[in-house]
Every structure is written in structure tokens, then in C-alpha cells.
From Swiss-Prot:
Catalytic residues of the enzyme: 84 (nucleophile), 139
CC cofactor note: Binds 1 Ca(2+) ion per subunit.
Organism listed in the record: Mus musculus (Mouse)
UniProt-recorded Gene Ontology molecular function terms: arylsulfatase activity; metal ion binding; N-sulfoglucosamine-3-sulfatase activity
The name this protein goes by in its record: Arylsulfatase G
GO cellular component: endoplasmic reticulum; extracellular space; lysosome
Locations listed in the record: Lysosome
Span of the signal peptide: 1-16
Reported cofactor(s): Ca(2+)
Post-translational modification: N-glycosylated with both high mannose and complex type sugars. The conversion to 3-oxoalanine (also known as C-formylglycine, FGly), of a serine or cysteine residue in prokaryotes and of a cysteine residue in eukaryotes, is critical for catalytic activity.
Lineage of the organism: Eukaryota, Metazoa, Chordata, Craniata, Vertebrata
Binding site for substrate: 137, 162, 251
């Protein structure tokens, strides 16, 4: 307890004037070959079709499209889960939720987070001499030792969970709409369905709450400024750096102001998409100016769009999940349909990652952990197994060999949290459970357990509308391979050193800069 208190005290000292006074940029340790800088940008609830390079109907991602033309675009890239916390945990550990313990989202009142016996990417790289920063949405625990500053990040600036998990003074756009924070103590806003509590949304700098409620309309620019300043300082330090940016975009457009010109042609979601694209462009521009030759920039998303938000949700492109939509309910976020986990993905590293290349390799967010560790010349943490693989040969254009098999866990739809209920085998996909997620029209697909799984050939049916005939030789051959692959991975997980997250809830852990005020307000109205 004494050690933890001391670290909290040191990291949480107030910032006065300039940037990163507690980040040690000095060089120490042995001399070694240059290690690449790593910038990972993770969008929130962004659809595969929200990237213009993927989907011609999208015209709002000029910076990302330019990055695609200058780097590699992955068209068969998948989130490790179909909702926030599990996907982010897998990004930072290279392990599925059944191994790392994070199978569903953490709440504002969550006591726990990503289990502390799980080793994060930042912890590995910091041991290798990297200076590390995390900017944006964390959502892997905010209380005590689960905070980013205790999970390998020298610097943290952001909201510790989703940007809709607390009230603000200008709540932006949501469906259904949510009211603003009460303007004075003693008033209640009656949050209603699908809105969070009256506690104001906090913005942290390291362990300090610096705004509560946060001003969402200026948040994207604050994230860009912090990212740019970190890259600037780290690039002159002589040390390699890791920057992980968890965007507040896309989610729902809580930060955008109403479009003034041509509103019929400029949706709120598109305005938010352009704002996100500008933020990414600023980060890439800084990399180009100060660290272009030795920096890998990897952009992707945590899961697909949130269909129940209707016009405030993103585009799945051609991955409609038609079988599910005909049954009712959503085939996007929370589900194992393609719209729930197939996400945009780009890699950029001039001189190393070939330009204007489209990769069809079957890849996953799980692969970032082992790939980055290999590029840094580090070793994987011992005494545990990993679901991701080193795909640097794919990154460098030397191979199109990705995964043969991927497993898609339930992320809040029908079935148990974290259960591997869908299996991807080459271009085939087998569903053992379907239904359970809400669509825009309010319908929820019936929970259906398929003893003989639905199997789709994605080369012929990217829309997942027509499964294979169960009596066909093709179905029987795929079924045999899928059954064996699923049995093997479940046995492998059973034999692994797995963790279990603490999902206990306690109102006393809610972030609060002013416990004497009902909403924890520290900012004047």
C-alpha cells in the first residue's frame, strides 16, 4: 500500500505550465540497434464503410484515404471483440477475453479493470527503453492500480471510459437524446433510458481530474495537441516512443456542433467523421515532420458501428448481416456478424510498409501486440499463450499469410460474455449462436442456438445472407474443420495461465473532483 501511495503521489502531482514534467525522456541502459517508434490510433465504433478508401460512398476521410494511398490498407481486419473493453484488453495483451479475463465492459462504478497479472504492450516496451503515453479513451479500469499510469504508460490524458458514460454541459447528439448536467446542486436531470447517471464526465491528466464535466466540443483538438507535443518531445529524446491514442470518435457525435451549411447534405455523423479525420491528420503530419523514417503508425477500430443509434451510427459497407436482419435485431456492434468486428485498418511507415497496397490477409487486433513486440526486439511475456501472431511479414509486403482461423467472442449479444460462438476458417464463417442485439427499430433478434452451425462462404456472401446447405459436401467438410479448431482452442485456453477480471461495482470509486457537489462538478457552468 505504501508503494502504491507513493506512486500515486508522484504521478499525480499538479502540472504547472508546461508539458510532461514527470515523463523521463533521458537515455539509460545499454546501447542497441534503433527501435521503431509506435503510434497506435484506435477509433471507437467506426464502421468498415466509414473509411472512404474502403467504401466509395464515404467522402469524409481525406486524411485517412491519403494514408491508405501512402501505406497499406487491410480489408479483412477484425476487432478482437465487438465492444469496447474486451477489444481494448486484447489489443494491449494479444489475448482473447477468455484468457485475459475481460469479457464485457467496465462501468463507471467498476472496482476492477484489466487484471494486473496481465502484461500490457506498454509495460513490455517500457522495459525495452521506450517512453510511453496514452491519450484518450482507456476503458480498462480507472480505480487504483488499474489506471493507465500503473499499466505501463508514463503519461495519460483522457477520459477513462466512453464519452457517453457521464453527463456534460453540452451533451451533443445521442439517440435517444440525453439531458445536460444539472447546473446547480440539488437538481436532478432524470437521465432516462440509455443515459448514464448525473455524475459529470471527467477528463484526467495522469491521476488528476482537470475538467469535470469535460467540454466535449474541444476535446478532439486537445487530444491532437497532446499527441503532437508528445511526439515532438519524444522524437528529440533519443529514446523510442509508444503513443496509443484511443479516440472518442466515432461512437455517437457527442462533440459536434450542428452543421450550418447545407444541412441536408451534411449529417451529424459525417461532421463527426470529418473531425476525427482531421485529428488523425494532425498526428500523422507531426510524425512526418519529426519521425517519418522510423515510426510505424497503425490506425484501426475497436468494433463496428452501434446500429441502435440509427442515423448517428456508422456504415458497415457491404457487410449487412442479412440473415440476422431478416430475423430482427442488429448485426453490428456486440454481435459476431461481420458488421460487428470487421473494422478499417491502415499501416503507414514510409520506406518499410509499401505504399498504396491492399492486403487481403486475415488479420486481427490481437496481432498488434506480438507484431510490435517483435519489431521492438523484445520477447513475449512468459508463461502464457497468445492468440495474436507476428504479422510483420504482411506489413512489409513480403507475405499475404494471415490467420487460417479466427474466433469471435460474444460481446453482449445472445450467449455468455466472451464465449467463442463464431469461427472464421479461411473464407468460411460458422455461427453457433445468433441474435440478442438491438437494431435501430428497437427489435432484438431472438436468441438462437445452432447445434448444426450456420456456415457462410464470405467470398460468395459477404452480406451473410445465405448460408450453405447443411447437407452439402462443402458444408460437411467445413463443419469438420471448424469443430476441430473450436475444440482445440477451448482446450488450449483451459490449459493456459488465464486471468479473471473483477467486475465488482461500488459507487465510491466513481471519479469525482468535488464530492460535495451532486454531479462532482468542478467546472463553472
Amino acid at each position: 500500500m505504501g508503494w502504491l501511495f507513493l506512486k500515486v503521489l508522484l504521478v499525480g502531482m499538479a502540472f504547472s505550465g508546461f508539458f510532461y514534467p514527470l515523463v523521463d525522456f533521458s537515455i539509460s541502459g545499454k546501447t542497441r540497434a534503433p527501435q521503431p517508434n509506435i503510434v497506435i490510433i484506435l477509433a471507437d465504433d467506426m464502421g468498415w464503410g466509414d473509411l472512404g478508401a474502403n467504401w466509395a460512398e464515404t467522402k469524409d476521410t481525406t486524411n485517412l484515404d491519403k494514408m491508405a494511398s501512402e501505406g497499406m490498407r487491410f480489408v479483412d481486419f477484425h476487432a478482437a471483440a465487438s465492444t469496447c473493453s474486451p477489444s481494448r484488453a486484447s489489443l494491449l495483451t494479444g489475448r482473447l477475453g477468455l484468457r485475459n479475463g475481460v469479457t464485457h465492459n467496465f462501468a463507471v462504478t467498476s472496482v476492477g479493470g484489466l487484471p494486473v497479472n496481465e502484461t500490457t504492450l506498454a509495460e513490455v516496451l517500457r522495459q525495452e527503453g521506450y517512453v510511453t503515453a496514452m491519450i484518450g479513451k482507456w476503458h480498462l479500469g480507472h480505480h487504483g492500480s488499474y489506471h493507465p499510469n500503473f499499466r505501463g504508460f508514463d503519461y495519460y490524458f483522457g477520459i477513462p471510459y466512453s464519452n457517453d458514460m457521464g453527463c456534460t454541459d453540452a451533451p451533443g447528439y445521442n439517440y435517444p437524446p440525453c439531458p445536460a448536467c444539472p447546473q446547480r446542486d440539488g437538481l436532478w436531470r432524470n437521465p432516462g433510458r440509455d443515459c448514464y447517471t448525473d455524475v459529470a464526465l471527467p477528463l484526467y491528466e495522469n491521476l488528476n481530474i482537470v475538467e469535470q464535466p469535460v467540454n466535449l466540443s474541444g476535446l478532439a483538438q486537445k487530444y491532437a495537441e497532446r499527441a503532437v507535443e508528445f511526439i515532438e518531445q519524444a522524437s528529440t529524446s533519443g529514446r523510442p516512443f509508444l503513443l496509443y491514442v484511443g479516440l472518442a470518435h466515432m461512437h455517437v457525435p457527442l462533440s459536434v456542433t450542428p452543421p450550418l451549411a447545407h444541412p441536408q447534405r451534411q449529417s451529424l455523423y459525417r461532421a463527426s467523421l470529418r473531425e476525427m479525420d482531421s485529428l488523425v491528420g494532425q498526428i500523422k503530419d507531426k510524425v512526418d515532420h519529426v519521425a517519418r523514417e522510423n515510426t510505424l503508425l497503425w490506425f484501426t477500430g475497436d468494433n463496428g458501428p452501434w446500429a441502435q443509434k440509427c442515423e448517428l451510427a456508422g456504415s458497415v459497407g457491404p457487410f449487412f448481416g442479412l440473415w440476422q436482419t431478416h430475423q430482427g435485431g442488429s448485426p453490428t456492434k456486440q454481435t459476431t456478424w461481420e458488421g460487428g468486428h470487421r473494422v478499417p485498418a491502415l499501416a503507414y511507415w514510409p520506406g518499410r510498409v509499401p505504399a498504396n497496397v491492399t492486403s487481403t490477409a486475415l488479420l486481427s487486433l490481437l496481432d498488434i501486440f506480438p507484431t510490435v513486440i517483435a519489431l521492438a526486439g523484445a520477447s513475449l511475456p512468459p508463461n502464457r499463450k497468445f492468440d495474436g501472431r507476428d504479422v510483420s511479414e504482411v506489413l512489409f509486403g513480403k507475405s499475404q499469410m494471415g490467420h487460417r482461423v479466427l474466433f469471435h467472442p460474444n460481446s453482449g449479444a445472445a450467449g455468455e460474455y466472451g464465449a467463442l460462438q463464431t469461427v472464421r476458417l479461411n473464407h468460411y464463417k460458422a455461427f453457433y449462436i445468433t441474435g440478442g442485439a438491438k437494431a435501430c427499430d428497437g427489435s432484438v433478434g431472438p436468441e438462437q442456438h445452432h447445434v448444426a452451425p450456420l456456415i457462410f462462404n464470405l467470398e460468395d456472401a459477404a452480406d451473410e445472407g445465405m448460408p450453405l446447405q447443411k447437407g452439402s459436401p462443402e458444408y460437411q467438410e467445413v463443419l469438420q474443420q471448424v469443430t476441430r479448431a473450436l475444440a482445440d482452442v477451448l482446450q488450449d485456453i483451459a490449459d493456459d495461465n488465464s486471468s479473471r477480471a473483477d467486475y465488482t461495482q461500488d459507487p465510491s470509486v466513481i471519479p469525482c473532483c468535488n464530492p460535495y457537489q451532486t454531479t462532482c462538478r468542478c467546472q463553472p457552468v
